[in-house]
UniProtKB/Swiss-Prot annotation:
Catalytic activity: beta-nicotinamide D-ribonucleotide + ATP + H(+) = diphosphate + NAD(+)
GO biological process: NAD biosynthetic process
Name of this chain's protein: Nicotinamide-nucleotide adenylyltransferase
Family: Belongs to the archaeal NMN adenylyltransferase family.
Length: 172
C-alpha cells in the first residue's frame, strides 16, 4: 500500500503506539500519524496539547532511520459526526489507502468507505494503555514509566505532565 493512517489521541504517546507505527511502516510506503482530538487539552482524558503530543511523537520516532521520509504527523480536531469522519480526514490529509487501528469503530468507518482497515497485534495491551498511564500519573503511582520511550518519559516529566494530571484530578 502507498499510505496508511495510524489514528490516536496519543495521551501520551507510548510504546504500544510505537509498535503500531512500526507495524504500519512494514505494510505501507508512508504512514500518516493522525493526532486526534487536537483541540482538546488540560482535561483528565486529554491532558496534553496537540503541540506537546506532536513533539513527544517526534522524540519517539527519531529512533527510526527513515522516519522523516516515510512519516508525517498531522493534528486533526474532532468532529461529532462519525458517518462523515473518514471524508473529513480525506479533506484534511494527503490521499491514503486505509487505516491501522485497534478501535472497532475506526475500523468499521474505514471499511464502510471501501478502504483498508488493518488491526495491528496488540503490545502489552493491559499494561501500556494511555488510560492506565494517565491514571497512574494522576494518582502519583509508579509503573507508567516503563510504557514510555525514554525520550518521551523525559519530556513528559519536563512539561510536568504527572503534576498536571494530579492537579486536574483534584479539580474534579
Amino acid at each position: 500500500m502507498k499510505r496508511l493512517l495510524v489514528v490516536g489521541r496519543f495521551q501520551p504517546p507510548h510504546l504500544g503506539h510505537l509498535h503500531t507505527i512500526k507495524w504500519a511502516l512494514g505494510r505501507a510506503e508512508e504512514v500518516i500519524v493522525v493526532v486526534g482530538s487536537a483541540q482538546e487539552s488540560y482535561t483528565l482524558e486529554n491532558p496534553m496539547t496537540a503541540g506537546e503530543r506532536v513533539h513527544a511523537l517526534r522524540l519517539m520516532l527519531e529512533e527510526l532511520d527513515d522516519w522523516c521520509r516515510r512519516l508525517m504527523i498531522a493534528p486533526v480536531p474532532d468532529i461529532a459526526m462519525n458517518k462523515v469522519w473518514v471524508q473529513y480526514l480525506k479533506m484534511l490529509l494527503p490521499p491514503f489507502d486505509g487505516v491501522v487501528s485497534g478501535n472497532e469503530l475506526v475500523l468499521m468507518l474505514f471499511e464502510d468507505m471501501g478502504l483498508a482497515a488493518l488491526r495491528p497485534p496488540m503490545f502489552r495491551r493491559g499494561e501500556c494503555s494511555g488510560t492506565r498511564i494517565r491514571r497512574l500519573m494522576a494518582s502519583g503511582e509508579s509503573g507508567w514509566e516503563d510504557c514510555l520511550h525514554p525520550q518521551v518519559r523525559r519530556y513528559v516529566e519536563e512539561i510536568g505532565l504527572p503534576e498536571r494530571l494530579r492537579r486536574l484530578q483534584e479539580m474534579r
